[in-house]
Amino acid sequence: VGSEMCIRDSSSMGRLFDAAAAILGICGQATYEGEPAIELEAAAWRALGGKTVRLGGNHTGVFTSADDSPILDPQPLIEALLNGIEAGAPADRLALEFHIAIARSSARIAREICVHEGIDTVALSGGVFMNRLLLQLLTRELKYAGLAVLVPHTVPVNDGCIAYGQAAVARTRLAQVAPQ
C-alpha cells in the first residue's frame, strides 16, 4: 500500500477475487489468467465439505451509491478477511464467507436496480460467473427475492458472451440508422 506501485481502480469483480486469494494466502501470484479466483473457489468448496450452503447470519457486504449507480465497497469485505485471519479462522472458511458476502451484496445491488428500473429479471454474465459457487449462491439469492435469473447456455458466460451481446447491440443500432 505504501509502495511506489501503480494501482488502478477497476470495475472487474475478478480483481476483487484476486485480492481475496492473495490476502488469504491461497494464491499470491497467478501463473495463468483466473488462477487466484479458481483457487479461491476451490478453497470455498473445501470449506463446504460436500454440504449445502446455509446463508444464515449477516454476510452482506456494504455498497455505496455513486451518481445513482450502486457499487460494492470492497473495504468491509477486505477488513472482514483480515479480521478473520487475525482471529485464526481457516482460509478455506474465509473463502466461503467471502463468496457468500459477494453473492449477498450483488443480490442486494441487483434488487435495488430492479426496483429502480421497474424490472424483475437479472442477466448474469461475465467471467466471474465461471465460478460455479458464486453463480449458485447469487442465483439462489436473486430467486429468493422473486427475480428471474438469466444465465447464458449456448455461448460462454465469460468475455465471449459479453462480446456476443455487444455485437448484437451494434447490429441493432446499425439496422436503425441504415437506409431500408
Task: Show the residue positions of the predicted features.
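A short glycine/serine-rich beta->alpha loop
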Residues: R8, R93-E97, L150-V157
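Short, small-residue-biased leader/transition segments that mark boundaries at the very start
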Residues: V1-I7
